[in-house]
């Protein structure tokens, strides 16, 4: 197998037994593909499909004037180039977006044309600016106002029709009341529901309910048509001899005979007996078609049609009328030969529509329309036209109602139609079909839907949400445009003057800036970025509300298998509402989640992959990835464990249709990074998945010794590492960039054969962690496409590395690991294992105030020299300065209002002039509890404001850096072109050339060295083809020079132009501080199995327990943390980690002993190829084997894929190979006494993470600070520099101890006794430590509260 550049330097030994048939797909595909489909930038305007921006514009245009004489049509759109690139946007705090220009056509028709003929009078086309559309970066994020944001996908209920019941909760009888709901993509909801009396009602948009027949009548159906649609009928023949029923024997089954049923003289069924299947067979056998029935049998039956006396035209009985003696007498009197009645029974043919029609008071279509109008617009007087229009617009107008393709597909599929397509609006048949299905379900003939089934929930991704937002903006524009087109002079206007695009821009801006689903990207580490982009949320607009979501919605559903991770979800109020996509999951064209399966044909597993959605999956038998398969791909077992219709079951192998593609198919990316996940309890695995996302990138990254094989994939797809775009040779490397000369076969004509990768150095992330990239390649290295060239934060040689491998012992140690506390060795701190760098951004803004402009300056009143020593002449701190709490970063003075001056100040003013006291110091200082090093300063100046010296220096340095970059780029490109030219001319026959080259001479290396490379292009050969190629090269070089000059000019313009600052801001200075945080007691650490704890103590190395060979352990964990938590994975990880380290040390000893290369090769083969996946060690050269062995000295990295990992036997074999005890336990000695501990201790290497819950960020101290305005009590919380609350229960504690003076101090001078605390401060300054407590402000507040109730209460002073 082929290894990538970094892979072969450190191959990870995998214990996986099964080959993955399918590569893990690109992890950010959901986001990237969705937005690509929205913009369709890669397609020509004519070829664009009906989705995204194009669909939104098409749905709103053409816009017609009210008269229809002027039409504004949409032609096409294009996106311009963004003004700034991603990095510039982040620095300047702007949005990374491109201008949208829409080509529209204004068509004016002739008003005076004859009726019916349309004569075009004028056509104008114009491109209109429609605001900025934010662009997605390569990694699936958006830069909005300078910060990276992610639009989280939403899991919402799919449009379509849903049938449900109330679970017996509505009525006290507990009767199930069924309902149907038609949910469109946009438009009014239509609900049908039963009440406890079995009448059917309709609601529109959840308003007041009306009988369902009102809606049918409004659709134009009369009573007879309604009855005919919903009921079968029985036919009765009436004559003077009696009544005969046209018999359909099947309809009698189960009824109790109300009269004797006879065949000739024989009684088949006696009166009051039940009619059974045997009786029906007898009747069918005798071919009985007509049955004599007594007239009592007819009474109570319901007429299915209007009965009219043909001779007189008189209406005898109405449709849906019950037949009584009176009605029967009238029928006989009029000699009606036959009637039809409704066929109903209590079992499966309920009379629901008939009952509903009785409570319906409307008679005609107009009555029904008016009734609906009254319900929708209560209080407005209805007119015929208004009622008609309102009803039309509700469900039948494409502008107001859209089921969407998904909705129509779900609708048709649910109603059993074969064609998944159809109109976006409702039709009469649709409404009738829904009612019929609802009645069928009430009759017991159908089932209700499960709304938590993933076939009924779909994913709405970025592209779709932005499209909806864009459409909303366009609809607002449409209203304004219609108004304008109706103005008298509209036909003389240009499209630009008619369309005001502000609403569109505003709605897009609002969505990206403040939507619930537009979130500040979680940028702690690469995993948290990837997970954030793969998140699906059920919350947000059009989704669920957190408070109203019940248990069912949050629960794991069988259809989540392979689509949504059952493990990774937040703890707390959002549990189950926010989920993560499974590793292989993707969305289909309709937005439903699909997961891949291998096709199984006649018990044989093929490599054919098919993606199935939850709807399609139900009908198949699907085997697990762990099903045993022989070498020919046949399933071995006769009975295979599989899934079918939401159940786990056993099926014979011939019945199996599909098989899972991978054992990690059911989990998300974060969960798939937990080794031995199969041995952890789900609750702890959930914590493990969530805590990996909080790991802070360490200063020195270290790959996990025990991983799962997913680490490389996550690091690659996260975008934090630099990946080669094209293969080639590394030409130049330094800390900030890598230059690759591209292979000839990968270069395209006109594209430079050089790739330059600028690395990100010490940049701040959203979470204040440090983003830094380090090159992995050396000049001369040959790299292929997609190889990792540089590591980013938390990556080590292209693998995700969130923490550090520590030598752990599971044992108690003096109670310091009580309750999950963690004891660590001082060695961990010394070696900077968990040292992290955090970058803080501090901003100072100079505004224009009413009293005059604020000024950034080093001339600050009443500040000593020492405080200004780190500032330059512009008043801004130097880069590299080490600052501590209280130091000035940026000096700033603000004009002070004219106050009443004291005589002394007047004197000073008279002597020293104005400046002394009319400004106050408002400098930016380092906040308390923070110290660090200034690593960067940026100055932003408003257009028209003079730039200070520092701003100019920064600008010049930036321009110089860009110039150097571009010149290097040009030099490398030229060198590349010259080398290609040299290869073309060497050894060829010359025609003419510089430097006295004779015609017919062969061109040699000496000749080429004697002239400048630029002159090589002047050589003319006798081979005309080569001459043309050389001319092309000369042309390309000229073109590149021109382009680079243009780019330099463009960059210079951007750097020197004024900045677009907020209104009233003259200048803004940003200072970046790098803060180094070592690990210390109070910091939170965790493993990957949900085993978290807080550091209780750091112990000197000499006091730590040590092993027989003198190695002290790094960290001591409490063994009681394992059994009750049921996360045994951590113990297995510890064993395997020890083995991995042991094998690495063994390789190290071999290298030290200068072992032969064959020896090393055979040992590596033993390590890699005895169990698990086979590695191709033989394909590596000797040098590569030595480099690999060198990289393995500190441990052989191992992978145990989830649900397919190392067995106990595998671990023991590895421990044996490393010459370590198979028990995984060792005898330890107490570092303080040297005594042996009583029992052997489990020792090994565990991967530990430092989480972003650092004690430095949580703890602070206050002496005096801000107070609340009303109560005058100190504020609370670190952000407000608040105090500690001494609450009710704490007061009880002091009361219990009788500590009266302490209590008095707490409640007065330390809290809200305003005079007392001022006096106390003064006393302490004077060295007098007495206190006088006065009355706390709380009493005054209480008095005021009581007075507000109208009770006058006064305190009497003694």
Curated annotation (Swiss-Prot):
Top-level taxon of the source organism: Bacteria
Keyword Coiled coil: no
EC number(s) on file: 2.7.7.6
Pfam families assigned to the protein according to its UniProt record, in alphabetical order: RNA_pol_Rpb2_1, RNA_pol_Rpb2_2, RNA_pol_Rpb2_3, RNA_pol_Rpb2_45, RNA_pol_Rpb2_6, RNA_pol_Rpb2_7
Keyword Protein biosynthesis: no
Single GO term (MF): DNA binding
Catalytic activity: RNA(n) + a ribonucleoside 5'-triphosphate = RNA(n+1) + diphosphate
This protein's GO CC annotations: DNA-directed RNA polymerase complex
GO annotation, biological process: DNA-templated transcription
PROSITE patterns: RNA_POL_BETA (PS01166)
Enzyme class: transferase
HAMAP family noted in UniProt: RNApol_bact_RpoB
Quaternary structure (record): The RNAP catalytic core consists of 2 alpha, 1 beta, 1 beta' and 1 omega subunit. When a sigma factor is associated with the core the holoenzyme is formed, which can initiate transcription.
Official protein name in the record: DNA-directed RNA polymerase subunit beta
